[in-house]
């Protein structure tokens, strides 16, 4: 991205912006300075990658991303301010590049929006796709609310959109690909149920697709683009009522899990696009709730996934469902009220979860032997 060029430039001038204390850590140099948020001398700067980290506030970002998040402004706006005010630079070239990148992003959003409309129209022409969705218990209203669609088997999207967009731009957006051998363009999503991935500002970032055919890949997503990074996106975040701060947000694995919960009125659920929960996901969630909660099956696979998430993230609440039941299946079988009661009775803090994993299996000695490991994860 163009903005990265200026972020690298800023790294060369950090000493002109902050008063650093130089410290050695593990064979490489770190710098310490006052935290932008809590003002204490607790913020570390890693000059090798330009990252600021504060263990008290829990962030790890470059200076532009950090300041733009604090001030709630666009990164380009914050970059221009830092360069102009702190480094006394002529920022006219920055503004030119900003306009170029913003225009490029707007083009990708428009392509994705038109693709979403196409997929929605194609769903109405596919009895098999409609039968699949209704067979999963989804109502017509839910299908419309989530803008679910269908990608036909052949290259119909390419033929439809190329009249309004350059093929190179369609490929950049990730809705079509190019065959390296023949140079021909093709639809990325074929014979798949389509799940548009929409941000909290109602912009279409990309798509997930679930096969209805014989593809070896059950689910695929849009490739990484300037506006879509799978490890940073949360499915259905736009459907969560963020006007008030939800007490809890449930984080599920699958698209259908999230949709099933919303259909039953559990409208504080999101999904991770089939990937493991990342630090980026976690930081996003903390903007909207104090209690992000991972929801997995109670079988061995679910427990292993929970362990990985806690080892990577740390302070998460945990809800393990009965074995062989995912959220979709559970709420269909037992209903909303039973699900809410199950949450109330079975939610665990990360401390409770780790303690139960050891002591619940009679491994009390292993629990005490692993105290240092657990403390490292939790704190």
Residue spans for each PLM region:
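Phosphate-handling DNA/RNA-contact segment within nucleic-acid enzymes
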Residues: 10, 14, 48, 101-103, ...
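Conserved active-site segments centered on acidic
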Residues: 76-128
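Short linear loop/turn motifs
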Residues: 26-33, 79-87, 92-101, 143-156, ...
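N-terminal structured subdomain of primase-like DNA metabolism proteins
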Residues: 1-96, 337, 341, 345
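Short, well-structured beta-strand/strand-turn elements
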Residues: 22-23, 136-150, 265-275
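Active-site-proximal helix/loop microenvironment
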Residues: 108, 115, 150-153, 377-378
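TOPRIM fold recognition
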Residues: 1-8, 55-58, 204-206, 213-226, ...
């Amino acid at each position: 991205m163009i903005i990265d060029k200026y972020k690298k430039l800023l790294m060369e001038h950090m000493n002109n912006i902050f008063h650093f204390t130089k410290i050695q850590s593990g064979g490489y140099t770190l710098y310490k300075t006052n935290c932008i948020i809590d003002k204490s001398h607790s913020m570390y700067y890693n000059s090798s990658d330009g990252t600021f980290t504060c263990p008290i506030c829990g962030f790890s970002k470059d200076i532009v991303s950090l300041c733009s998040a604090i001030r709630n402004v666009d990164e380009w706006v914050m970059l221009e301010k830092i360069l102009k005010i702190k480094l006394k630079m002529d920022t006219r070239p920055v503004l030119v590049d900003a306009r170029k990148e913003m225009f490029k992003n707007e083009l990708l959003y428009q392509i994705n929006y038109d693709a979403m409309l196409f997929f929605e129209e194609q769903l109405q022409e596919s009895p098999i796709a409609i039968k699949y969705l209704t067979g999963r218990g989804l109502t017509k209203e839910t299908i419309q609310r989530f803008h679910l669609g269908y990608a036909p088997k052949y290259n119909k999207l390419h033929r439809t959109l190329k009249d309004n967009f350059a093929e190179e731009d369609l490929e950049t957006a990730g809705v079509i690909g190019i065959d390296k051998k023949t140079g021909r363009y093709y639809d990325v999503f074929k014979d798949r149920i389509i799940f548009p991935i929409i941000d909290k500002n109602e912009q279409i970032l990309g798509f997930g697709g679930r096969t209805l055919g014989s593809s070896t890949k059950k689910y695929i997503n849009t490739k990484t683009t300037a506006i879509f990074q799978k490890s940073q996106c949360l499915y259905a975040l736009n459907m969560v009522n963020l006007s008030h701060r939800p007490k809890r947000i449930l984080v599920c694995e699958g698209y259908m899990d999230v949709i099933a919960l919303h259909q039953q009125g559990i409208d504080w659920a999101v999904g991770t696009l089939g990937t493991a929960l990342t630090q980026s996901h976690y930081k996003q969630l903390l903007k909207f709730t104090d209690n992000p909660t991972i929801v997995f099956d109670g079988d061995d696979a679910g427990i292993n996934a929970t362990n990985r998430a806690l080892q990577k993230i740390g302070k998460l609440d945990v809800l393990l469902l009965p074995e062989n039941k995912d959220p979709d299946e559970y709420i269909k079988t037992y209903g909303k009220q039973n699900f809410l009661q199950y949450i109330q009775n079975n939610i665990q803090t990360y401390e409770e979860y780790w303690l139960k994993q050891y002591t619940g299996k009679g491994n009390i000695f292993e629990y005490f032997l692993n105290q240092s490991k657990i403390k490292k994860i939790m704190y």
